[in-house]
Amino acid sequence: MRFRGLDLNLLVALDALMTERQLTAAARRINLSQPAMSAAIARLRNYFHDDLFVMQGRELILTPRAEALAPAVRDTLLHIQLSVIAWDPIKPAESDRRFRIILSDFMTLIFMEKVIKRIAREAPRVTFELLPLDDDPDELLRRGDVDFLILPDLLMPNIHPKAKLFDETLVCVGCPMNKQLEDRLSMEKFMSMGHVAAKFGRLMKPSVEQWLLLEHGFRRRIELVVPGFTLIPPLLVGTDRIATLPMRLVKHFEQTIPLKIVEHPLPPLHFPLAVQWPALHNTDPGNIWMREIMFDEASRMEASSETSAV
């Protein structure tokens, strides 16, 4: 199909090339042979009167013209896919849908593991790609490159729909042999002790406990930074360091790496965890189905926590 002389199929090829930045990967993404993709590049260059891509090693470097085209091409294809082409109703037992989800290692272990096990029973052909926390999740959501973002609500962008999953509480923990934890922690002592903290992404963004502590005007002495919450418990054992961790994570490790929970000198640090999805996926039957599974599993977790607290 052509529109003003442009074969619209070429936009699909152009988007794949701009996303993958590699000829072979782009061809594989849209099920073209490498010669066919090379031919598509030649036709694109002829239409736009620009090289569009310059090869450096194995990577395709976008020209300024291609960089300018990228957002418009992606948005056009997304709107066609999500607004013009009718959504197929999902049949879980037959679906081979792949869901891409950005979340922390903590949420993978505590929450997503339950969802994945349930999906394996109810929709065995559905697959997942779990991605580490990104420096710019808003852009990935806008482009529809990911299906879900699971984060503390306060760290989420506000321009996409979202919904609460469950509440979490942060607790102060350390090695049971740490003699500094024998008495109640004063704020002065808490701030003077060495801390282990998780930071995420290339920019090493602070995690939720850092945001909440900064909100109260406190800066800890962070002696060790790691790229995930699940790395922290073993690094506290045999040391005088402490950490502020989600209670569910501490409970998860209590059989293998028991940690001492001490009363936090700050007021209770509660926060809601939420799931967010691209606005363009709001009416996608597959996305709705997965959301409902997540909400159901989150409700079960909340109910289980309330029961164990009684």
Curated annotation (Swiss-Prot):
The keyword Transmembrane does not apply. This is Nodulation protein D 1. Belongs to the LysR transcriptional regulatory family. The lineage of its organism: Bacteria, Pseudomonadati, Pseudomonadota, Alphaproteobacteria, Hyphomicrobiales. PANTHER family: HTH-TYPE TRANSCRIPTIONAL REGULATOR LEUO, HTH-TYPE TRANSCRIPTIONAL REGULATOR LEUO-RELATED. GO terms for molecular function: DNA binding; DNA-binding transcription factor activity. Pfam families: HTH_1, LysR_substrate. InterPro entries: LysR-type_TF (IPR050389), LysR_subst-bd (IPR005119), NodD_PBP2 (IPR037416), Tscrpt_reg_HTH_LysR (IPR000847), WH-like_DNA-bd_sf (IPR036388), WH_DNA-bd_sf (IPR036390). PROSITE patterns: HTH_LYSR. Residues 6-63 form the HTH lysR-type domain. Residues 23-42 bind DNA. It comes from the Bacteria. NodD regulates the expression of the nodABCFE genes which encode other nodulation proteins. NodD is also a negative regulator of its own expression. Binds flavonoids as inducers. SUPFAM superfamilies: Periplasmic binding protein-like II, Winged helix' DNA-binding domain. Keywords: Activator, DNA-binding, Nodulation, Repressor, Transcription, Transcription regulation.
